């Protein structure tokens, strides 16, 4: 019985919807008929005469005020639309029209299969957007105390955002802590130090951890029970405390290197001890994993210190040894540090060998991989490349390969060329980057701009060819050429990672919606009319009457019809009518 009632209601609802969709004219005439029947009880004639009398008594000042009010409202709508577009990247009116008005007008299909498919598609796209908008740690990140803080002292600007530093704190807690830290007082202090927001509190905690370790290091162990001989046993130093001091307290790279060497001595001892005990239980295994992360981090930062201090060959050797010793730790992306150091040495054959290993279709790409490959291809032809000669004779095979490599790199990250060509000013790179985003472009160009300048003609080739990439991908948010479509979320994530004084590069460049342009034009036009009418009422009245006479004249209607017919003939390419021929008998 309930099912029958439900079916009847569904049929009634569908009939009403059908009647409103296809029989709107019938409803319209019914309303007109009711108005005509009820014209006497409703006193429609009297009301119309009252309204006409009221309109006749209105002065021109009322119309001027009305026009000014509409102009003010249009201006407020324009300001709101512009703010909403800058914040969310879309028009508010357009979004409301598509999201709310379109379903009411019957623009949504009610088929359950389509709904299920769309929901699955939405979940897939959301999953893809989450993976594409993953934030990565910058493998070439600077030192806070020796580089970021010195920039703040000189300029008074903060180069790092709170969001970026919060991500670094989470990384430190993941890499440098484990569940057994509470058993060792120094590690327990450092576990709290990594969660501190105040830099001075973190530095004080690191010093406290080293002092506690120094006090507890003198443990008296009797060698023989009946003897008075004692041994002084030194406990291992806290390696993570030295890491924090090297990163945040050291004001020069040389000071940071000294602290990292002390951290290496302490971390290497902890790593060897935990390596022997890692199979004794899950607790020892977690401790060994933590000690491995600490040791790899220290060695990588020592190699970066050597690179900063000009000992590039030593840095390359340290990076190669580290990659051989820990080949599975790809989270640090040490190969990108190695590529930058090899480019500094101009060891292009070694760079090509590293690219052959890491520029694989199964491995995640980066701007360093793609643009370094493009630089090597451009190096072979850039010194002799000329756009005029290429336009006359065409591109050779080597030039075509170089152009394709540049197009591939630009498709992966379209923000990099503006920094390499110095069309946008560089800032200090953040500690975290977003693949294919503006943050990654800054991090790459900050270290690799000198390598592009060193190759003669490379920047000229990039300048002549990089914009051709966009012709191959006219809709980058929907379909890519060699990579997945460009993720939509990069702009929002980059604004969180980059400081407020930097103008975030947006791709693809959003154009102002039609609603904003229309509102701006309408607002300006009505404001101008209101001002002119208020200042010159008689002249504007004569002008309005003249315009009405022109639009209502027969000559204007004839000219408009002729222009319309001529335009139709041009578009349809209607041939002229053949002329009649007269034959004489």
Swiss-Prot record:
Q: Which CDD domains match?
A: ST7
Native species: Felis catus (Cat)
| Record field: transmembrane | 15-35, 62-82, 512-532
Query: Which InterPro entries does the UniProt entry name for this protein?
Result: ST7 (IPR007311)
Q: Which gene encodes it?
A: ST7
Phylogenetic placement of the source organism: Eukaryota, Metazoa, Chordata, Craniata, Vertebrata
Q: What is its main location?
A: membrane
PANTHER family, per this entry?
SUPPRESSION OF TUMORIGENICITY 7, SUPPRESSOR OF TUMORIGENICITY 7 PROTEIN
Which family is this protein grouped under? Answer: Belongs to the ST7 family.
Task: Give the membrane topology, semicolon-separated if more than one.
Answer: Multi-pass membrane protein
* Record: glycosylation sites: 47
Question: Which UniProt keywords are listed?
Answer: Glycoprotein, Membrane, Phosphoprotein, Transmembrane, Transmembrane helix
UniProt-annotated location(s): Membrane
Q: What residues bear Phosphoserine in this entry?
A: 386
List the protein's name. Suppressor of tumorigenicity 7 protein
List, alphabetically, the GO terms of the cellular component aspect.
Answer: membrane
């Amino acid at each position: 019985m309930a099912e029958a009632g439900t079916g009847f209601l569904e049929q009634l609802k569908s009939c009403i919807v059908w009647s409103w969709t296809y029989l709107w004219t019938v409803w319209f005439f019914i309303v007109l008929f009711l108005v005509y029947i009820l014209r006497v009880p409703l006193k429609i004639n009297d009301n119309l005469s009252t309204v006409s009398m009221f309109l006749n008594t209105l002065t021109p000042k009322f119309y001027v005020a009305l026009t000014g009010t509409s102009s003010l409202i249009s201006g407020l709508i324009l300001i709101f639309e512009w703010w909403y577009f800058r914040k969310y990247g879309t028009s508010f009116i357009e979004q409301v029209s598509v999201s709310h008005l379109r379903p009411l007008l019957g623009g949504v299909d009610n088929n359950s299969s389509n709904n299920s498919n769309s929901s699955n598609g939405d979940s897939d796209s959301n999953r893809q957007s989450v993976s594409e908008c993953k934030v990565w740690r910058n493998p070439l990140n600077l030192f806070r105390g020796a580089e970021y803080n010195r920039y703040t002292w000189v300029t008074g600007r903060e180069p790092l955002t709170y969001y970026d530093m919060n991500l670094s704190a989470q990384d430190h807690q993941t890499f440098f802590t484990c569940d057994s830290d509470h058993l060792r007082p120094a590690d327990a202090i450092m576990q709290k130090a990594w969660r501190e927001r105040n830099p001075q509190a973190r530095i004080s905690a690191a010093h406290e951890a080293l002092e506690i370790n120094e006090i507890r290091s003198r443990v008296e162990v009797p060698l023989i029970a009946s003897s008075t001989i004692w041994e002084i046993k030194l406990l291992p130093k806290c390696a993570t405390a030295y890491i924090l001091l090297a990163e945040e307290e050291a004001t020069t790279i040389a000071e940071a290197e000294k602290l990292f060497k002390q951290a290496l001595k302490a971390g290497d001892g902890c790593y060897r001890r935990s390596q022997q005990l890692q199979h004794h239980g899950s607790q020892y295994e977690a401790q060994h994993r933590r000690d491995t992360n600490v040791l790899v981090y220290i060695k990588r930062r020592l190699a970066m210190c050597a690179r900063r201090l000009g000992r590039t060959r030593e840095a390359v050797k340290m990076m190669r040894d580290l990659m051989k010793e820990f080949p599975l730790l790809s989270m640090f992306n040490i190969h990108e540090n190695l590529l930058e150091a090899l480019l500094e040495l101009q060891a292009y054959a070694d760079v090509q060998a590293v690219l052959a290993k890491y520029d694989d279709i199964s491995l995640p790409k980066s701007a360093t991989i793609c643009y370094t490959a493009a630089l090597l291809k451009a190096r072979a032809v850039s010194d002799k490349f000329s756009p005029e000669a290429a336009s006359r004779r065409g591109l050779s095979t080597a030039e075509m390969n170089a152009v394709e490599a540049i197009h591939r790199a630009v498709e992966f990250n379209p923000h990099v060329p503006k920094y390499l060509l110095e069309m946008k000013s560089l800032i200090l790179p953040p500690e975290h980057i977003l693949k294919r985003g503006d943050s990654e472009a800054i991090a790459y160009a900050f270290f690799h701009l000198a390598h592009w300048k060193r190759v003669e003609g490379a920047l000229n080739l990039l300048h002549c060819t990089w914009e051709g990439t966009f012709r191959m991908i006219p809709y980058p948010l929907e379909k890519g050429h060699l990579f997945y479509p460009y993720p939509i979320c990069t702009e929002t994530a980059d604004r969180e990672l980059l400081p407020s004084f930097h103008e975030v590069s947006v791709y693809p460049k959003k154009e102002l919606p039609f609603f904003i342009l229309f509102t701006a034009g309408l607002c300006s036009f009505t404001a101008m009319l209101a001002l002119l009418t208020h200042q010159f009422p008689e002249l504007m009245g004569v002008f309005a009457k003249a315009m009405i006479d022109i639009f209502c004249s027969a000559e204007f209607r004839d000219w408009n019809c002729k222009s319309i017919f001529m335009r139709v003939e041009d578009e349809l390419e209607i041939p002229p009518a053949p002329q009649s021929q007269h034959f004489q008998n």
